[in-house]
Curated annotation (Swiss-Prot):
Residues 1-27 are annotated as: Disordered. This is Large ribosomal subunit protein bL28. It comes from Limosilactobacillus fermentum (strain NBRC 3956 / LMG 18251) (Lactobacillus fermentum). InterPro entries: Bacterial_rp_bL28, Ribosomal_bL28, Ribosomal_bL28/bL31-like_sf, Ribosomal_bL28_bact-type, Ribosomal_bL28_sf. The keyword Ribonucleoprotein applies.
Length: 62
């Protein structure tokens, strides 16, 4: 399963609850994007969440 290279975010699981409080499993997936970033001074293609990109924790390399 893919995960965010920087923050380690991956799919989270939980329950969908109806009005009668019946439960069924559901999942929340991070918005992963394939990006080329610098890792140890070298460009590398990795999966990074859109939130990580927007926050400026990492910058893309062209």
């Amino acid at each position: 399963m893919a995960k965010d290279f920087i923050t380690g975010k991956r799919t989270q699981f939980g329950n969908k609850r109806s009005h009668a409080l019946n439960s069924s499993r559901r999942s929340w997936k991070p918005n992963l994007q394939k990006a080329t970033i610098l890792v140890n001074g070298k460009p590398k293609k990795v999966y990074v969440s859109a939130r990580t990109l927007k926050s400026g924790k990492v910058t893309r390399v062209n």
